[in-house]
Amino acid sequence: MRKLYCVLLLSAFEFTYMINFGRGQNYWEHPYQKSGVYHPINEHREHPKEYEYPLHQEHTYQQEDSGEDENTLQHAYPIDHEGAEPAPQEQNLFSSIEIVERSNYMGNPWTEYMAKYDIEEVHGSGIRVDLGEDAEVAGTQYRLPSGKCPVFGKGIIIENSNTTFLKPVATGNQDLKDGGFAFPPTNPLISPMTLNGMRDFYKNNEYVKNLDELTLCSRHAGNMNPDNDKNSNYKYPAVYDYNDKKCHILYIAAQENNGPRYCNKDQSKRNSMFCFRPAKDKLFENYTYLSKNVVDNWEEVCPRKNLENAKFGLWVDGNCEDIPHVNEFSANDLFECNKLVFELSASDQPKQYEQHLTDYEKIKEGFKNKNASMIKSAFLPTGAFKADRYKSHGKGYNWGNYNRETQKCEIFNVKPTCLINNSSYIATTALSHPIEVEHNFPCSLYKDEIKKEIERESKRIKLNDNDDEGNKKIIAPRIFISDDKDSLKCPCDPEMVSNSTCRFFVCKCVERRAEVTSNNEVVVKEEYKDEYADIPEHKPTYDNMKIIIASSAAVAVLATILMVYLYKRKGNAEKYDKMDQPQHYGKSTSRNDEMLDPEASFWGEEKRASHTTPVLMEKPYY
């Protein structure tokens, strides 16, 4: 058996070697598969080093070879379709012994930096109203908040009321409008709980005790088992108050309820449904709205501070350009602009309502008669979980640029891919804090990326090895802006960018191969579309690499199976001896026993409900 194992293993490795290295296959053949398909290039991604193009194949252009005039230089020089267009040398802005070629790869140096502003990806749910997930409790489906990022400055306004939403819900004989959204008092107190109280409560929990205050608050709220259902995935949302460092668990997950059929703004009718809506208000500056899914590394992957001296833009072949189509509103300051962006941001609020939904008087009658079927739709239209279970998945007008000079707020729904350095602007998002600002613009980003790309290419073409004439070859990336104009390797004199706090220079004499359309889409220009037909994949050996990876994985699996088989045969006796010791098997590693489990009787004989929270809306009577 062991001989068979060795034979199979050697055969497998031989097979893998032939796929990867054998039969003289050249993996860099045909890097551009030309076609007539027109591809957008919004999604530029940096390729791993092993997938990058050899940007220097056949042609070399030295200084003495350039004899064209200025008008010819932008279009008429030969283009190496293997990946490089030579940069003209008349201006002699770099060493005469250097041969500079321009890469054809339109990479984006902002990719990593801007990842946290891809809100659809990093948050994945509504912002203004977050009801992006469903969970079952006692056989019934309910909607609940699910955003992965904190929403800074978000709170709930109860219309025509002085009651704050962080006040506990009405209980016992209290009128509905006497209560808010938070959990009622408990013994021991679980909400609100101070940061120090949570630290002490979870001091022996390795999974929770070292979390930051926002994530800790989210996990604390998530430890509550609704309706005594330990198998439910439903988790309550929470609000953390930075001012007093308290975590408030929200008993009501609904965030908006408007319209005469669903609520009553008349304060004199104390026991009628109150109207409410989400907002970023001055009163909520220190609040942060949290779902059960807030990631523990949110500080790295989610936006918090607004960006001073910055304007969101789109990366277009070597430079960051303005977003052409925006919605412009007046705003006196950054707070008002951030508030406007929030109001227009992604929302999971239902868009259609059931025709047969009863008005609030009938819902009130349901409270009076303790008829759960009449009141289960309270606090949001029934359509939210029957006729219309809308989920935005984070798509919306989530970004804005605030112009401090004109006091205009420019709001848009296209994912920004770079930042423009402009002293008049502040870039903001619907998730960001209403007033907190990051002051440090990454001025060295372009220079650092240019250096990194040149070094990366030099390793491939052995830049340090001089040719016969003592010349060096440099493959310059398609980055035409930098705070170091010498790093641009520009064939003309770079121009200084106005309103730039970084003193950026831009090279304008190299032909740009992409443009922005009127609908905010970045596309390759018509004359270059054949060369970039593979965009956004843009990996010449992508299909081959998939085959190689799959075959290598298959070989590894085969080898593992054989090794496990031999090991099992050798250790059969010991295995069965161990199986006689039940204490080694089936030991749970879960921490359900550590989760808070409030008794159902805590809420009284009747409980509250809505389609966003699994507990009935009937007021608890103590």
UniProtKB/Swiss-Prot annotation:
Q: Where is the signal peptide?
A: 1-24
Cite the InterPro entries for this sequence. Answer: Apmem_Ag1, Apmem_Ag1_dom_sf
Looking at the UniProt entry, the stretches that span the membrane are 547-567
Stretches assigned to the Cytoplasmic side: 568-622
The UniProt entry's coiled-coil ranges are none
Region (Disordered) spans which residues? 578-603
Q: Which GO terms describe its cellular component?
A: membrane
- What keywords tag this UniProt record? Disulfide bond, Glycoprotein, Malaria, Membrane, Signal, Transmembrane, Transmembrane helix
The UniProt entry lists the main location of this chain as membrane
Record topology, Extracellular segments: 25-546
Question: Where, subcellularly, is it found?
Answer: Membrane
Task: Give the record's glycosylation annotations as residue positions.
Answer: 162, 286, 371, 421-422, 499
Disulfide bond residue pairs: 149-302, 217-247, 263-275, 320-418, 337-409, 443-502, 490-507, 492-509
Membrane topology of this protein: Single-pass type I membrane protein
- Give a short account of what the protein does: Involved in parasite invasion of erythrocytes.
Name the protein family. Belongs to the apicomplexan parasites AMA1 family.
What protein name applies here? Answer: Apical membrane antigen 1
Species: Plasmodium falciparum (isolate FCR-3 / Gambia)
Gene, per the UniProt record? AMA-1
